[in-house]
């Protein structure tokens, strides 16, 4: 799948957390541990992010959850050697995006992550080289309207990911 993403010009994955990376909707109020939440990571998403990191693609988790410390701990448990490479943008009040881009949906989260990656790694990321994977149709629509590639993740159909990636190459 990574080869297909690279062939489509994708170098940055922005992935939603609730109901996309994990199979639960925490509503930003998970009271359990990161280890307990780790059991809810979808195998296909775990592998996609592992492969993306191995291929030196940029990765961010973009979420409306304010529980970014918990999400950071989940990424540390998932990828102990590479978790620090994953940017996390949630509604925790710890970041600000003041650019000219869209403020709808996950767009400011993505733009803020791109700013950090550009400063920290001299990353060359554009809207066309970005892929949002999210289970929320409105977030997907907001991305597409703004020229960002997007795949609507269907929680009960994990193969939608492979089909979505294949469709990127056809566009």
Q: Language model features by range: what are they?
A:
Residues 22-23, 55, 68-72, 96-97, ...:
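Short catalytic/ligand-binding loop motif for oxyanion handling, primarily in non-cytosolic enzymes
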Residues 127-171:
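Acidic, Mg2+-coordinating phosphoryl-transfer loop and its flanking beta/alpha structural elements
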Residues 45-75, 89-91:
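Substrate-recognition element of Asp-dependent hydrolases with the DxDx(T/V) motif
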Residues 30-33, 77-79, 148-150:
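Glycine-rich, phosphate-binding/catalytic loops in enzymes
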Residues 1-58:
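Active-site neighborhood of HAD-like aspartate-dependent phosphohydrolases
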Residues 44, 65-66, 105, 135, ...:
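Short beta->alpha linker loops
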Residues 67-128:
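Substrate-recognition "cap/lid" segment bordering the active-site pocket of phosphatases
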Residues 13, 88-90, 129-135:
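Extended hydrophobic secondary-structure segments that form protein cores and membrane-embedded regions
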């Amino acid at each position: 799948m990574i080869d297909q993403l690279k062939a489509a010009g994708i170098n940055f994955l922005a992935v939603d957390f609730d109901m996309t990376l994990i199979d639960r909707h925490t509503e930003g109020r998970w009271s359990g541990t990161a280890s307990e939440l780790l059991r809810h990571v979808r195998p296909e998403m775990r592998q996609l992010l592992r492969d993306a990191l191995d291929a030196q693609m940029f990765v961010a988790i973009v979420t409306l959850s304010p529980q970014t410390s918990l999400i950071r701990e989940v990424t540390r448990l998932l990828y102990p050697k590479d978790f620090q490479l994953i940017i996390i943008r949630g509604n925790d009040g710890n970041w600000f995006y003041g650019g000219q881009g869209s403020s709808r949906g996950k767009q400011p989260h993505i733009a803020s992550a791109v700013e950090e990656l550009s400063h920290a790694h001299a990353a060359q990321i554009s809207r066309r080289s970005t892929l949002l994977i999210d289970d929320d149709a409105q977030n997907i629509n907001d991305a597409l309207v703004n020229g960002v590639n997007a795949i609507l993740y269907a929680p009960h159909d994990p193969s939608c990911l492979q089909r979505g990636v294949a469709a990127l190459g056809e566009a």
